[in-house]
Amino acid sequence: MARLSLLISLFSLALLASAQAHGAMDRAAHKKRGNCRPKSATSTSTTTTSSTDDSQPTSTSSSAVAVSTPQGSSGGGGDKCGLGWPNGDDGTILSCSGQCSWYHTWSVFPVNVGSALQFAAVFWGPDKADEWDANILNAGTNIAMFFNEPQEPEQSNIDALSAVPYWRTHMQYLKDQHGFRLGSAATSSNPNGIDWTNTFMQACPDCTIDFMCLHWYGTTVDDFTTYVNLWHTTYNRNIWVSEFACQNFVNLDQQCDDVPGFMAGAVAWLDSQDFVEHHAWFGMMRDMQGVNPADGLMNQDGSLSSLGWQYVSS
């Protein structure tokens, strides 16, 4: 525990010394990214909020999720590459020649059960509990991830102690009775993210967490790798980076000069680390929700952007 406390203290001091390091997001800046939460499948709006939270996405094509599953690729796509696919933004996931292996929708609803990509369900937040329980066993997956940025007021917004009963009631039985692999809550890269997770882990030693989920936004590969390494060494578990991009939320006037270069360096490092199981660049969507449009993997017509092709194919 002394080692854990020291690591957290050093991490917090480093972030305070440089707000940009590790992609720290203050609440006002984070709000500009919008709510990454499931949207109505019938909505044509590109906003990130929905008038209802109980609608599930539908596919408009039987070819949804047509990216082939790779066999041990070490390229920029590779078997670690994933897609964050916001529900309702498009009816299908693009067919492409890349090698991504999985996707999530910030929800319990897959785009198309039985498709080529592995679906990872996300229990987005407390208000999704009934929806989660009603659908998780029919979602065509054995992977479940916990709350989305719970320490952020504009996201799932729940303190760590209050989150523990939700895990015990809605997550743990999936592991114990159905053999699911379970991922932690995915906190933002604010300094309080690791504090939230530390409190949760201490309060719930009986919670079976198979891998740690995390989000990161910043502008240097060194800061990114330092942050991911910190989570691995602190919790001694494998890592899923379910959101990351080259984005400065602290100073919006200082964005990445070379997004493709950042992606190339970050993805190459992720793919070379045995403890990193999967990653998903933000984002595969038309509306980038306050993130630099240069980070977008999708053009406005729904086709892959040049960066999108780099991510899934390089």
What are these regions (language model features)?
Residues 40-70:
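Extracellular mucin-like PTS domains
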Residues 76-145, 157-158, 169:
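N-terminal carbohydrate-binding/catalytic regions of secreted carbohydrate-active enzymes
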Residues 138-160, 181-191, 207-216, 240-241, ...:
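Active-site groove signature of glycoside hydrolases
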